[in-house]
Amino acid sequence: MIRSSKIANSLLAAVLAVCGASIGASASAADKVTVQLKWLPQAQFAGYYVAQSKGYYKAEGLDVTIKPGGPDISPVQVIAGNAADVVVNWMPDALAAREAGVPLVNIAQVFNQSGLMLTCKKASGVSTPKDFKGKTLGVWYGGNEYPFLNWMAKLGYKTDSDIKILKQGFNVDPLLQNQAACISTMIYNEYWQVVDAGVKENDLVTFFYEKEGVASLEDGLYVLEAKLKDPAFVARMGKFLKATFKGWNDAVKNPAEAAKIVVAADTSGSASEKVQKRQMENVAKLITNAGTAKIGYLEPAAFERTVKVLLAAGSSPVIKKDPGKAAYSHVVWEAASK
């Protein structure tokens, strides 16, 4: 009986060990977070890299994988295929995807201002939006074209006759080679590529979408709606936001440090600290809530303005109906604020 008792105890211990290992593995798996970026490693995403590098995610008990984006990577497709828990995306693309059947929900809005603009050479004869007529304009597609199409509709231009659209690659060559009068640029990136290529700022004219009244919200964080029904997911993402906001606050406060971290994360070796520092300084201008308790909070009024812009696209609206409050949630942001 003693021997049988020992065997039974041994078996029980083994079972408990296996169960414990299984539970531990489950807990570990639950702490994993994969975030899909919209583009390649650069200061546009410094907050995530800073949070990773300085151990902020680890301090929250998270194992975070940061997946760089690229010209052939759609954040919407990635999260729809369950290859990411959360994605960085622009609101126009996210709302268009939601209407098309991918139920994305905004859980945080990092960028409060738009950095998108059209950059034109004065020599092309463009000095005001009225001069766009008859001109070739470079436009990014893949979800980035929506703000432009809305703007043209507001101006009363037909994109198939009044202007010529050049589907712009993710470079500034069309402007440098005079293939287009204007091209799409971000204040923190492509605009400076034009300047670095030798074009004097005095020879350029820029049109900020923000100032033209056609800006839509850009870099925000999105998850699948069904996931928000899981309290464990909400808690995990709350920790993710808390650490991410800490990373962004640091990046805004110390652009030079952020630049070094971003360069270290760029496995291609093409990034430079000088360029990334400048980019971070310009990105900081778009995160107006950095350093405050409101960082990452999506203002309902800002959401409504974006929806209004997207619906006002003439015969080709980005979305056909107002998605309503279901398209965003503050539940994760509130969890991060506790």
Summary of predicted features, one role per range:
Residues 55-59, 155-159, 197-200, 268-269, ...:
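Short helix-capping segments at alpha-helix termini
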Residues 50, 116-126, 217-234, 291:
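A bilobed periplasmic-binding-protein/Venus flytrap-type ligand-binding module shared by bacterial periplasmic
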Residues 31-177, 181-188, 208-209, 215:
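Short, glycine-/small- and polar/acidic-enriched structural segments
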Residues 1-14:
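Bacterial N-terminal signal peptides that target proteins for export
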Residues 303-338:
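Conserved C-terminal helix/tail region of periplasmic/extracytoplasmic solute-binding proteins
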Residues 92-93, 170-174, 178-268:
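Pocket-lining segment of extracytoplasmic ligand-binding domains
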Residues 230-313:
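Secondary-structure end/capping motifs
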Residues 20-26:
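N-terminal signal peptide c-region/cleavage motif recognized by signal peptidases
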